[in-house]
Amino acid sequence: MANVVVIGAQWGDEGKGKVVDIYTEFADNVVRYQGGNNAGHTLVVGDEKVILHLIPSGILHEGKRCVIGNGVVLDPEVFIMEITKLKANGYLKDDKMLLLSEALHIIMPYHKRIDIAREKKSGSKKIGTTGRGIGPAYEDKIGRRGIRLMDLLDEKAFTRKVKEVLEEKNLILTQLLGDQPFTFEEIYEEYMKYAETLRKYAADTSLILHQETKAGKSLLFEGAQGTLLDVDHGTYPYVTSSSTCSGGACTGSGVSPREIHEVIGISKAYATRVGSGPFPTELEDETGEQLRQAGREFGSTTGRPRRTGWYDALVARYAVRVNGLSGIAITKLDVLSGQETVKVCTAYNYKGQVLTEVPASLEIMEQCTPIYEELPGWNDDITGAKSMAELPKNARDYVARIEKLSGAPVVLVSVGPRRDETIVLRNPFELN
């Protein structure tokens, strides 16, 4: 039995959903522990494409319990839409296999309206929010003004708490942001309907996960976004509002750090970023567009084109350090097929100074230019490769170089979007 955390080792969109889908076969429980429906996991099962924003990817596997932990902020409407669609497609046959932490926070309609209005008002200083109310919901959580699932399920508590905050929210909307206010009645009517559906999924998930570990059952923690978007360790303020690093798996689920055995970081064979913020290896030329089209780099949540660039070994080393990565999974290696040469950033140039680690200062990082190591590319179609030996030598050398520069072993290589287009080098659920 092993408990494994899967996190993004870059700026999100690394292919975590596919890796989690593969690892779910070995797990008894799949746990989502942070973020909200600003995340989008795209899975390809056979010829079927499934996009999930809230519910853990493990839901596609019958007999696996899926848990949405206390660290998540949940939009009830989106959650209900997802379970409705999943059931219509033959998934989630047993409601008991999907649990919501009673302590998770609820995204309210004023969160979404504030989020959108603020972004419009930001002008050139936009963060790149998805406008789904994630940030404002976390603000209320930290400010001790949040509405938790347990509040939503208690009509009196819900009424009291919403009335306490609504006057302030309406002042922000009307006086500061020039938007429309809400009435308590419209919120109450909408959210009491949601409560009827959510009630059957609510549970003390921290206790249940504790009981599962004591019974020898395994846990797989499914992270959203990526390390460089972490609210503490990312490129602040161009970050998300939650703890995307491995430590967030414990605080966002109520599982002890002593119960974590492996942390696997997911990293594309190149790099992408959505929204604003520093991106030292960004390619704004024909090569960047080639990577965008070949990798279909458009957000599964927003549809926005992603910024593309070469692999950044400094970012990889940083992710290894702050997450304690025991392994790296490389995705989309196939996208690099056809490139005459491939590049890896091994250092930054900052005003003539060579930096070998990611700088803490955003202002410094914004002025860094990449120092590249160039490796020969390959033309072969590698999507059919079932082992490293079946890859072209140059592709193997590229993976080996990533491994050496990052400082963590490569445990999986994805050579295509399908579940079976994967080379598994080590299974983290098999403890030595």
From Swiss-Prot:
InterPro entries: Adenylosuccin_syn_GTP-bd, Adenylosuccin_syn_Lys_AS, Adenylosuccinate_synth_dom1, Adenylosuccinate_synth_dom2, Adenylosuccinate_synth_dom3, Adenylosuccinate_synthetase, P-loop_NTPase. It catalyses: IMP + L-aspartate + GTP = N(6)-(1,2-dicarboxyethyl)-AMP + GDP + phosphate + 2 H(+). GO terms for biological process: 'de novo' AMP biosynthetic process; IMP metabolic process. GO terms for molecular function: adenylosuccinate synthase activity; GTP binding; magnesium ion binding. SMART domains: Adenylsucc_synt (SM00788). GTP binds at residues 12-18, 40-42, 306, 332-334, 414-416. Keywords: Cytoplasm, GTP-binding, Ligase, Magnesium, Metal-binding, Nucleotide-binding, Purine biosynthesis. Gene3D superfamilies: Adenylosuccinate Synthetase, subunit A, domain 1 (3.40.440.10), Adenylosuccinate Synthetase, subunit A, domain 2 (1.10.300.10), Adenylosuccinate Synthetase, subunit A, domain 3 (3.90.170.10). Its EC number is 6.3.4.4. Coiled coil: none annotated. Signal peptide: none annotated. CDD domains: AdSS. IMP binds at residues 13-16, 38-41, 130, 144, 225, 240, 304. Substrate binds at residues 300-306. The active site is at 13 (proton acceptor), 41 (proton donor). Pathway: Purine metabolism; AMP biosynthesis via de novo pathway; AMP from IMP: step 1/2. Belongs to the adenylosuccinate synthetase family. Plays an important role in the de novo pathway of purine nucleotide biosynthesis. Catalyzes the first committed step in the biosynthesis of AMP from IMP. This is Adenylosuccinate synthetase.
